[in-house]
UniProtKB/Swiss-Prot annotation:
Localization (cell): Membrane
Residue ranges with Low complexity bias: 50-68
Domain of life (superkingdom): Eukaryota
Organism: Arabidopsis thaliana (Mouse-ear cress)
Gene: TBL20
Pfam families: PC-Esterase, PMR5N
Motif, GDS motif: chain positions: 200-202
Organism taxonomic ancestry: Eukaryota, Viridiplantae, Streptophyta, Embryophyta, Tracheophyta
Annotated protein name in UniProt: Protein trichome birefringence-like 20
Function: May act as a bridging protein that binds pectin and other cell wall polysaccharides. Probably involved in maintaining esterification of pectins. May be involved in the specific O-acetylation of cell wall polymers.
Keyword RNA-binding: no
UniProtKB keywords: Membrane, Signal-anchor, Transmembrane, Transmembrane helix
Alphabetized GO MF terms: O-acetyltransferase activity
């Protein structure tokens, strides 16, 4: 009988030792994952609900260039989309950006829904009105070359026999919302008692003519016939509203040289640190300023800074540094913004209208190039590249810098009227050879730079009105 008792005593001693040996191993394989999964669930559930509350503070309103808009307004808009409290930043993968959180554990794959998700309130988010497609609009156009007398001859495509009329029957549709068509009555009420200046080259003038034509359904303005169109003012007496144009080729001071070739290949002296006085001396009296430029920077230039020549473009003169067109363009934009930001007591709104690409095919403008398309591109059929891409990038960069520096003038508001992508899709919207008589001898025989009226440029005023109605909106990221 002693043998079993001896075995029992030995077993009572050895069994606890075995348990002490394997217990840590069992804990590592089973106990710790269970504890980790439970504690992580509690932590994520708590942090998710707090993140959803605090996430609006992550919005950056001061830096502006992205493809999204955001507002705290509770009032719905015709082009709002619902979304939850979490800001869905495509560049961020933080946990609070997910509606459902995925956690792996030893027990399998758990889908964890943050606490109080059902209590989240819907907010309204403004979409990017500049990202979209052209869609058919059988109701267009809203004026003709007979109802509007402001159309420049070179953009009067119907008068000069353009055979296809489909280019007029499109409207811009943003991807995630709707863009209301231009309402001339609403526009004139918003700008009642104000002044609006367009500063730029002939494409800026093209924009002004489009606006005047759209407003002609309400009122024809009184213009000073003694003034050259490039520096003209139009007065809408009923609304006490004035439109003015300031012609400037480069935004900064430019002088055509007396030596060298003449015509479109003539040289200009460009003073990169001096704004063009034709607009800089008068612009402070306006409430709205729309600035634009671009086409004139791709021609022969001598560049000056502080009255000293620092280089040239397309000059090929021994001993003179040949720089790129975009160097001059960047400096000119920076000087322009610096001038406007430095205006004393100016509290208006300044719009940078971005570059509208030309569409020459088969050669350059002076080498037989033409634009014969009759339909818009889809957004997946073409892309911005080369000089157009670099020009647009410079505009975004300089706008961002100016927006950062505008705190010196608290009342001034900078806005980006980004038409580049939507106009890239409209190779069919140019006059081509239908801006003059066939036998006329003109410098730009096939015009693939300017835009027919009526035509796609009318949508720029859809944007302008929408932005005037929504002054509190900022582009979120650049």
């Amino acid at each position: 009988m002693e043998l079993p008792a001896t075995k029992l005593r030995i077993g009572l001693v050895i069994f606890p030792l075995i348990l002490l040996t394997i217990a840590p191993i069992l804990y590592l394989f089973f106990g710790y994952p269970l504890y980790y999964s439970t504690s992580t669930y509690k932590h994520l559930s708590n942090s998710s609900s707090s993140s959803a509350i605090s996430s609006p503070s992550r919005y950056n309103h001061s830096s502006s260039s992205s493809d999204s808009y955001k507002t705290e307004d509770s009032e719905p808009s015709s082009y709002d989309n619902d979304y939850d409290d979490t800001y869905h930043d495509p560049k961020s993968s933080s946990l609070h950006n997910n509606d459902r959180l995925s956690i792996s554990s030893s027990n399998g794959h758990h889908q964890v829904t943050p606490k109080k998700e059902h209590r989240r309130k819907k907010r309204k988010r403004k979409c990017d009105i500049f990202s979209g497609e052209w869609i058919p609009n059988p109701k267009a156009p809203y004026y003709t070359n007979t109802t509007c007398r402001a159309i420049h001859e070179h953009q009067n495509c119907i008068k000069y026999g353009r055979p296809d009329l489909g280019f007029m029957k499109w409207r811009w549709k943003p991807k995630e919302c709707d863009l209301p068509l231009f309402d001339p009555y609403e526009f004139l009420e918003i700008v009642r008692g104000t002044r609006m200046a367009f500063v730029g080259d002939s494409v800026s003038r093209n924009h002004v003519q489009s606006l005047i034509c759209l407003l002609s359904r309400v009122e024809h303005p009184e213009g000073d016939s003694q003034q050259e169109f490039n520096f003209q003012r139009w007065k809408y007496k009923t609304y006490n509203f004035t439109i003015a144009t300031f012609w400037t080729t480069h935004l900064v001071r430019a002088e055509e040289t007396e030596t060298g070739p003449t015509g479109p290949n003539s040289f200009y002296n460009l003073y990169l640190d001096e704004p063009d006085p034709t607009w800089a001396s008068q612009i402070g009296e306006f409430d709205y300023i729309i600035i634009s430029s671009g086409q004139w920077f791709f021609r022969p230039l001598f560049l000056f800074d502080k009255q000293k020549r620092i280089g040239c473009l397309y000059c090929y003169i021994p001993g003179v540094r040949n720089v790129g067109a975009h160097f001059a363009y960047r400096r000119a934009l920076r000087t322009t913004f610096k001038t406007i930001l430095g205006l004393e007591n100016f509290k208006g709104e300044v719009f940078l209208r971005t570059f509208a690409p030309s569409h020459f095919e088969g050669g350059e403008w002076d080498k037989g190039g033409n634009c014969l398309k009759t339909r818009p591109y889809r957004s997946n059929e073409t892309e911005l590249d080369g000089m157009n891409l670099e020009t647009h990038s410079i505009q975004l960069d300089e706008f961002r810098i100016a927006n950062r520096d505008k705190n010196r003038n608290d009342g001034l508001n900078l806005r980006l009227l980004d038409v580049t992508q939507m106009m890239l899709l409209r190779p069919d919207g140019h006059p081509s050879r239908f801006g003059h008589k066939r036998e006329d001898k003109v410098i730009l025989y096939n015009d693939c730079v300017h835009w027919c009226l009526p035509g796609p440029i009318d949508s720029w005023n859809d944007f302008l009105l929408d932005m005037l109605k929504n002054r509190d909106l900022k582009r979120l990221k650049y």
